């Protein structure tokens, strides 16, 4: 997805990303420091749009993506600073969001336009 490509490009090039999406999902386990989707999703774009339209995805929270890592199985996780304070969970206010949750529950991202890959900037008319 363009959301993932832009976010990955930004992080790779030293930028951070503002994330706007759903923190009310049952699999957004902030106290445990994880956000993930429990079942595989075949078409994230279609399913994300459907969830936004039927309001099963809420636009209710913003956070700050500062890094991306891979687990021992090769799954991508974004390392994210939450705004709820350093003492709000056992990870000092951070959490790991797996790529599937990011693709399904992201509503918007905020990034410096220089961090957007050239092909996507062109598509956007920037």
Model regions and ranges:
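Active-site signature of cysteine proteases
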Residues: 1-126
